[in-house]
Structure formats: structure tokens, C-alpha cells
Amino acid sequence: MSPGLPVSIPSQPHCSTDERVEALAPTCSMCGRDLQAEGSRLLPCQHLLCKDCYQGFMQELGHATRAYPGKLISCPGCQRVYLTRDVTEHIFLQCFSPVKPTMARNCSECKEKRAAHILCTYCNRWLCSSCTEEHRHVPAPGGPLFARAQKGSSGVNGGSGDFALYCPLHTQEVLKLFCETCDVLTCHSCLMVEHKEHRCRHVEEVLQNQRMLLESVTSQVAHKKSSLQTSAKQIEDRIFEVKHQHRKVENQIKMAKMVLMNELNKQANGLIEELEGITNERKRKLEQQLQSIMVLNRQFEHVQNFINWAVCSKSSVPFLFSKELIVFQMQRLLETRCNTDPGSPWSIRFTWEPNFWTKQLASLGCITTEGGQLTRADAAAASYGSLQGQPSFYQSHQAPMAQQEALSHPSHKFQSPALCSSSVCCSHCSPVSPSLKGQVPPPSIHPAHSFRQPSEMVPHQLGSLQCSTLLPREKELACSPHPPKLMQPWLEPQPPAEQESTSQRPGPQLVSQPVCIVPPQDVQPGAHAQPTIQTPSIQVQLGHHQKLKLSHFQQQPQQQPPPPPPPPPPPQHAPPPLPPSQHLASSQHESPPGPACSQNVDIMHHKFELEEMQKDLELLLQAQQPSLQLSQTKSPQHLQQTIVGQINYIVRQPAPVQSQSQEETLQVTEEPPAPEGPKPALPVDKNTAAPLPQTSGEETPHSVPPVDGTSQHSSPNVVRKHATSVSIMGFSNTVEMELSSTRLARTIEPQIHRVSSLTAAPTHTIPSLLSGPPQTVSSLMSVSNHAMPSLTASHLQPVPNLVRGTFQSTSNLRGDSSQAITGLASNHSQAGPSLMSGHTQAAPSLATCPLQGMPPVSDVHVEPRSVSSPGSGPAAESLGTRDGAESSLGNALCKMESEDCTRFSDSVGQGPTASSLDGPKDLAIPSELEEPINLSVKKPFLAPVINTSTALQQYRNPKEYENFEQGALELDTKENSDIRAISSEPKIPYVRLERLKICAASSGEMPVFKLKPQKNSQDGNFLLVIECGTESSSMSIKVSQNSLPDASQGPGLGGRKVTVTSLTGQQPQEVESTSEEHRLIPRAPGAKKNTPAPIENEDFCAVCINGGELLCCDRCPKVYHLSCHVPALLSFPGGEWVCTLCRSLTQPEMEYDCENARYGHPGVRVLPGLSMYDQKKCEKLVLSLCCNSLSLPFHEPVSPLARHYYQIIKRPMDLSIIRRKLQKKDPAHYTTPEEVVSDVRLMFWNCAKFNYPDSEVAEAGRCLEVFFEGWLKEIYPDKCFAQPQQEDSDSEDVSGESGCSTPQGFPWPPYMQEGIQPKRRRRHMENEKTKRVSFRLANSISQV
């Protein structure tokens, strides 16, 4: 293809924008400056050079300005070599270069070059005011004037025909023909002269053929590019995996070092204490003997002095008188015996085996690899390549013979470093063989790259470690070796030739000491005894599991009889090892181990690693128990971060042997990943909760969530949380709800419409429903528990029921300009808020009974609106309780009072709800004996009391619950005789709440309800405060009234607008009710409505909540943009149209005009993907998520500027990616529904992993996940989808600088070698991590 052919490429209409921008890069590849229209060069590799760089580059190569053909030129960008004749002028830049703002603003027509005022867009010339009048465009047919005006400039439309390239020979002729024989562009004149007999065609025909060829080539390039991106992503994941594994093993080694140091200090301190005890006992005995001798000596001196004085005195009579006493005393002293034997010389010494412990330290641990082919030659090449500054991945292609030699002679390539600087370091060490000198690798090699195996250690190298115990400390330090780092010591046995050569060398012949390992019996009391595994000639090199006392390992007496000469050590120490001679005798008859023995050793290694790490975790859990009690809701991965600190990884891989008891023990200390399949909710009601022998004092707020449904009843290690329900007006039965982890609840009612908020309800508070006066009650009531901050915040099954209606007009009822009453009922884990509006000033109630003195009006039973599908119907608010934190609602009296304080003689038990008072201690007490609670300021005006009684029956799903529970709502309306008097002065509501008989919680405190007006009472803003001890919660209540109703309307709703606000940031939804429609008519409980309400479409798109050109569904109120709908539509349909949520899956009413429909036309090769049935189901799932108001943060990817997000989240996922992969033309199109569900769950998992559990985004993600699982169960009722496994990674240490996938595509690393060098992150101090953890815990406590 000729260099001039690329001129036709920009005119292709199907060329994508990204490819066009890539081909027309505006900067020079050498200097990086903007290119000029003249003199720029285009290389065959599509790199660009400016005029100056090209000339300088050619001069540096020794060429002239005009390069000779046949010379070579190297591209400065990609280093590829081309012929200089292939470098062409950059015609693209001339064709598509924009008008520079720095161009001259002078007139191009007149000679005076006056200032230009107008730009002629037709010929791209600046004109002054005088030339503008004369400037006209009257093109003559075939005239050259128009062509010259367009020479070298883009036309008006920017098409291929507007840009003209003129012949260099015939300057007036345009190159409109293409000679296929010569492969060049030509004009008519050249065609007649040089290309007479050649095959020439018009440029447009050639463009059409070339376009088809380029499209096929472009598709192939795109496929190869996608495969390369996938491969590069996998390799990059491997790089970060290696980095993560390196940090993990490094932390394990550090932990082993720390544990060994602690054990050494403990043992040394024990020995010192033992020494002090022995010496102190010996010293005490000698001091007692010395004291007795000194006392006897003083008595002798005293008697001797007395006798001398008596003899020397001149009076003899006293001497003779006391002679007998003196003789008796002297005789007694002579007969007194005293132990004067000091005993034999007593010596004490400390004996230990330095050689044994040196060997043990030398075999402290090993580094094993699983998977991947990393030979020793590759490791050595990587080590030496890193020293020489060369990339290690090029070494394998340069010296194949060196690799074979290294593999055939591993002992010469991987000898251990010399332990002594000279052949004999001291008189007690054996000489080092001269053959070992010169084989020591350079000391600058990183120790992580040095590999050696114990079987290759020269025997007299081991012998050189055996120094005498009586040497001075300096000599012992000189002889002690550095612990070598081993790599798979048992995978490559010693060659026979090496064994023969070592057996012939002089010096003490030592082999690795056989170690017999027995599992510790005190780790698991119920565990079965594991068989003893012996490894005769292999050093079992365990990791940090050697940190405990050596009594856990029992040595068999057949192989290692205890030597009698040394004294027996304390019980906590292991028997001393064999002397070198006994080691030699016991190891001479042992053969090298086979593959089975190596596998057994590997099995034991994993088993003991798990056991010891489990013990470490238990100790850490006990040490940090207070902090753990406040962080039970955190994921297992986050729990490890807060507990272990620097230990960033804990092995959870079970050993490949029978370790059932071990796994049962691990269930107590670690939170396992979520089990597969949803966990059914418990159908808790009065009947099922009654036989539970549970009291309010038995609750255990600090508990570990159970693993699955089976372990909740069988495993004794599972701790349950008994939620104490609050008995209100006779409901004294307690409810026991089992907790699960934050991502286990997957069950939800199919009739769910929209999840709006969650409520955090502790066990000893009353999340009872409170409806305030002139405003709707918010659908979120959060009561914080400082001892247990929202243990599980995602398990609720809210079923919103919005009941709108009017009360039937009666003869004794009159219209009133009253406010709305909102009755909310929280029922177990299912919440059904029923919003009922009536003419009343204010009546906050839970559930009411008829009042005395008024004839009750006929009960009005209202059924909740039936919802055909979870996503259809108008949006409704929802109220839920967290994790079944139960609130049992009883009945309460709520009435309005005037100044005279009307007395009621009717008892509480009378009425339709008297049957619910079944508690033994809840008696029917007359209401006049109870003093009401006043929550508002009394007004001086009077009003007659009019009572209206209504009963609201709560619907319960028969599939999940077995019975119904009724709650009665009684409205007491009160009106003023003079409406003008009311409207002329400020309205202050007057509310009286009857005292509720409430069973006190375990803390013994009762809740206190306060109603406070905010700012201006005329606005209808009130604050409802609920206080229970030190905890408090509040909600804002507002009722807006559009206009005062007429008296002729009766007790209708009067066109009032009720707003239910949610504290989770969801948009308030307004429900307008009028007296002409939706009247509450007395009917049977099972009766249905006569005429359904007409569908009023929404004003904003159900997905993006924006306006514009919207497409209305004929079966539901939702409207969509064409691009927001799933699947995205290409054109507006004609006639009746239904959305994906309303369209039938089995018999669709219509087919959408979308990409998938056009992609599936006959003749188009279709890649394997979802079936049509599964495609419709998955589109319905995704659209239901997009229509949820909580899904707005998940519509688009996280901004690439949030670098911390892509450091923590390795696999970003959002709804836009899922929608794109649902298209059949996408290379990553889904093939099974499991992939769709896995991506959606991955999106929720990323949300829960990155955000704090108490944040709004995390709470929205949990609500949306519950909503999705309900839809999934409805669409796929008979299919079970596996739960995603938790990622085995630590967000603190796994840095994803370049591992994130941004929306613009795969982030390729730069060409330089520094691009693949990982950045080193600053390690945090331990105290900083502790502060950060405590700060998160404090935030989780203060969150309401």
C-alpha cells in the first residue's frame, strides 16, 4: 500500500472516535510539543515527528535533509526500524487541523491588509467590512477558483470530498483517481500520460473496498487486543498476588521470630527463677547452720568469762557455793551438739545443647510453593539478573545450556553460604573442605532468592556447628551460623552420587535428625488421636507453630531414648536431644523418604500450622475481649485487621486430612464465609414465641453469628442472641431470633416493592411505633445501643403497605381542618407501615380501643394494595427492624382532650382488641385510674369531642407466617365551632397519650416520649424524641395542608398531602388523597376494591430520576429514557408499550428495538451467551435494581480519582458494567445467569468491603442486596445460586496502584522498566493502627 493511501482513512464513517484520536495524535513523539500543519512526518507505526525533530534526527544519523532511499530510520517512540522512504508527510494534520486562535486577523482580500471583522466560513477567509460587500460565491462549473480556495483546508462539512489533494506535476488537477497497478493516487492528466493501460478506479470506489478490508482487519485487531488485555490483566494479577504472598509470608516469619523470642525470654526467666530458688535454699540452710554455731559460741564465751571471773575473785565461799551450778552448765555446753560439717564442695552449672538448638534454628522454617514452575535455575537467573540490572524474564532465552547444567548439578549451583570465614574458626570446629570455597554465592544476593535443601548440606559443615559447651561466649558467637532460608527441603532428594561423595569425606558424618511429631492433645478435647507420622531422614521444618512448649511433641523412646547423664529438666521442657554419636548410629540405617512420606510431612505441616494459629487467635481474642465486644459486626477480614495488627493474613486452608474437630474449633474463633443459599427466616409470632422459656435477663448481646442453619442447633459452640421482646398491653411473650452474619440473609417477600430504610433496634429498647400530631411519622426510627452497635444491619424483610382512603361520613360527624394521623406497626422482622389520613387535629397512637361514652362507628377493614410484581406500582416507604430485633405491638388508648378533661368509664379491655390481652399479669384496668401523659400545651378554646373508631387489619404473608395479628386504630377527632378563630391565632397541638402497660426491659428503664415543636409551629414541623435511659432517638414530623376543606365534605381528607420522610436520604414521596376517591367502605376482610385507580405516570425517569423525553409504560407508572431502560432502546416504539418489569417472560407482548435484537439477525455470527429466556430474566433483575432509589451510587463506576478505592477493591463492579455485559455484542457477554448474579453480589461485596458498616452507602448496599435477593428468589424460585467466597486478601497491605480497571479501559504500564516496580507503602506504627481501630469503633457506637 502506498504512503498516500491513508488519506482516505479519516473519511470512514464507521471509524470509532478512539481509533481516530489515536491515529491523529496531536503531539510529537520525540519532543512532545504540538505539531504544525507543515513539515510534520508520519511514520509507518503511526508515530508523529515535528519538522524540527525530524530534521535534527536525520542529521544525527548522518543523513542530509533529503534522506536517500534505502536508508534505515528508528522510531523514537517504539524503537522500530523503517526505511526512510516509508516516512510520509502527515496529511491528516493538514486535513483536520483546527483553526488556531493565534492566526492573523487581517483581511485576506485587500492589499492594505486592514483588520478583519468577519470570517467567511465557506472559503475560510478573514474579510474586512469593505471586502465583505464585494465578496460573493458564484462558482462556475469546473472553474478553478473554488478549488484553489479550498486547497489545503477542510471544507464546510468536513467530508472526504471537501478536502482536495493536488497533483505535484499538474498543480491545477486534483488527485481523484487511484491506480491499482502502481498503487498511487493520480489525476486525469497523469492517467493519460503515465497510467494509460493501468487499472484505475475512482477514489470513492477504492475507499469503499478499503473500508470493508479495514473493518475486517479492525475486528481482528480488536479481538486480539481484548485477548492481550485479558492476558495482561492476569499477569498483573499474578504480580500483585506474588507481592501479597511475599508480605504474608514475611509477616508469618516475623510472627515466628516474635513468638520464639517470647518463648526464649520466658524459658530463660524460668531457668533464672529456678536457679534463684536452688541457690536461695542452699544459702538459707548454710545461714541457719552458721547462726546456730554463732549462738553456741556466744554461750561458750559467756560461761568461760564467768568461770574466769569466779576463779580470779578472792572470795571462795561464793565459788564453792555455786560450783555445782557452774559444772552443770559447763557439762551441758560440752554435751550440746552442733553440725559443724560444711559439706562437700557444692557446684551448680547450666547445661544445654548448643548444637541441637543451632540445628533447630537452622531448620526454623521452610518456604514452600504450590503451583507454578519455578526451577532453581530460574531463581538463580533472577538473582543474578537483578544484580546485573537486567530483566529476569529475558534470562531464560539467552543461556539454555547454563540452565541444563544448573539442573544437572544443583549442588554446585546452590551451596549454602560459608559459616566461617576461614577453614578453622576455632580449635573445636572441624576444617571446612577446600572444595566448598569459591562456591559461595555473592553476599549481596537477597536472602529471599537463595535456595538450598538440607540433604545437600555437607556433613562436616554440620559438624562445624558442634562447639563445646564450655567455650567462652565469644567463641560460641563465632561458631554460631546464620539461619539459612530453605526452599522446599523435601521436594528434591539428594542424588545418589552426592550421597556417596559425602560418605567418603572425612569428618563426623551427620544426617538430619529424625523428628517424630505427635499432634498436641490439649488443643481439641474432642478430637480423635491422629496417627504418628515419622519422617526418618527429613527435617520437618515447621513455621511459627514451634512457639509453644516442647511438651506438645512426644518423642518415641525407640528412636530417642533419654540420656541419663544430664539432670532431668522441668516438666515443661522437652527431653534433651541425642548426642551426635547416637544421632549417627540411629540415622545410618535409615533410607531417604519417598513421595508418600513427603506428602505426609506436608499434611502435618499444614495441620500444625492451623492448630497453632488457632491458638494464637484465641489468645489474642482473650487479650482484646473488650474491644471485640464492640466490633462483632465487622467482616472476618476486618476482624483480623483489628486483632492481629501486623499479622495481615491468617491461613484458613484446611489440611488435606481428616480434621473435622479442628474445623469445629475454628468456627468459634473465626467467622467463616457466607454459606451457599439463602437462610429462611423464622416465622415468629405469638403462637410460636409463647412456649419459649426465655426471660428478659437471658439476652446475650455479645455473640458470634452462627455458621449455618445446621450448626445453630447442633454445634455447642454457636452462641445465640435472645432478643427480649417488649410486652405491650398483654403481649408478654418473648421472641427468640437468631443472628446471622451481615451477608447471610437472603430471604425476602416476593411482594416487596421498595426498600427505603433500616431501623436499628436493640434488645432492651422499645422500637414501638409512634405517630405524632401534625406531621407524618418518618419511616426510620434508630435507637442506638452502646453495648452492641447494630450487630446485623441487613436482615429485614420489609413489606410496605400504603393505605389511602377516607372515612365514611356519618350523621353526627362534622368537617374539621385537622392534620394527618400516621399509624405505623412494626411486626417482627416484617414491617408494614400503613398510612391512614383522617380529619383530626393530632392523635399519636400505637393501636387503640374504642372509648367509652361514644357509640363506635362500624369498623372499616382496609386491605393493603396488592402488588403484582416487586418492581411495579407506586413507590412506598418501608419500616423495618434490624435482624429481627423484635417489637411486639399491643394496644394503646390515644385520645384528644379539651379543658374539661372528659372522664372515660369504659375499661381498656372492651372493644375488638380485648381478645389480645392474654398475658397473666396484664389485667383490664379502667382508664380513669391511669393518669394520662400530657405532651403538649393546652389551648384556652374548647371543642366538642367526636370519636371515630376504625380497625386496621395487618396483612401477613401465609407462606412465611401462619396467623394474622390485628391492631386497632381509633381516631378521636375534635373540631372548633369557629374555624376563623382557629386560623387567626397560632395552632399549638394538644396531645394526651394513655400510659402503656409495658414490661420493663432488662435494664429496668422505661422509654420516655417527648414532642417538641420546631421553629414555627405553623409550618407543621415537630420533633418526636424517644429517650430510654442514656439512649435517645428523634424523628422529624411534618404534615403540609394545601387548603382548608369545606364543611360539606364531611370527615373527608380534604385534598391533604401527606409526606413520609426517611432518614436515609431517600426522596420523600407524596400521596395525595381527596374526598371523592378511595373512600373507606365497610366490607368484609376478604373483599376487594370495585374499581382500580387510574395509572398516573411519574414525572421523572425511574432509573436516573431526571426529566426529558420519557417513554411511559402502559401497565405501571414508571417512565424511562431510551438509554436508561434495560435493554436500552434504539427508537421510540409506536402503540402500546410495556417495560421489562411488566412484560411477560414466557409470552412477551412485544419485542424491543435494541442492540440484541439487531445483533441476532440472520447471517450474523452470534457468540455463545444467555438463552432468550434467561436473557429476559436477567434484564428484569438488573432493571429492578436500577429502578430502586437506593441504587443511584451503583449506576456508574467509582471515579478514578479515588485511588484508595482501587487500592482496596481489585475487581470493581457497577450496574453499568453489568448492563454492558448483558449485550450480546460485548466480548465479555454473560453465558449463564450465575455470572450475572455473581457480578451483582460482587458489587454489594465491594460496597460492604470499602465502606464503613455504619455509613449510609453501606446501609443502602445492604438494603439493595436484600431487595435483589427477593427478586432473585421470585424470578428463579427453583434455582440456588452459590454465595461468593470472601477474597483472601488484606486491604491494608494489598496495594492496587495499577491493578484497578478504570472505565476508560485497561491501564497499560509505561514502556520503561520502572513501570512494573511496585511502590513501597509507608508502614504504620502499631499504636497508629490501634488508634485507627478505636476510632472506627467509636464511630460505630455513636451512629444512630
Swiss-Prot record:
Sequence ranges of Polar residues compositional bias: 499-512, 656-668, 904-916
InterPro entries reported for this sequence: Bbox_C, Bromodomain, Bromodomain-like_sf, TRIM66_Bbox1_Znf, Zinc_finger_PHD-type_CS, Znf_B-box, Znf_FYVE_PHD, Znf_PHD
Main location: nucleus
Gene3D superfamilies in the cross-refs: Bromodomain-like (1.20.920.10), Classic Zinc Finger (3.30.160.60), Zinc/RING finger domain, C3HC4 (zinc finger) (3.30.40.10)
Region Disordered, residue ranges: 478-513, 541-600, 655-719, 861-888, 903-924, 1284-1344
Binding-site residues for Zn(2+) 2, renumbered to this chain: 167, 170, 190, 195
Residues at which Zn(2+) 1 binds: 107, 110, 131, 137
PANTHER family named among the record's database cross-references: TRANSCRIPTION INTERMEDIARY FACTOR (PTHR45915), TRIPARTITE MOTIF-CONTAINING PROTEIN 66 (PTHR45915:SF7)
Subunit relationships: Can form homodimers and heterodimers. Interacts with CBX5, CBX1 and CBX3 via PxVxL motif.
Name of the protein in question: Tripartite motif-containing protein 66
Organism annotation: Mus musculus (Mouse)
Organism placement in taxonomy: Eukaryota, Metazoa, Chordata, Craniata, Vertebrata
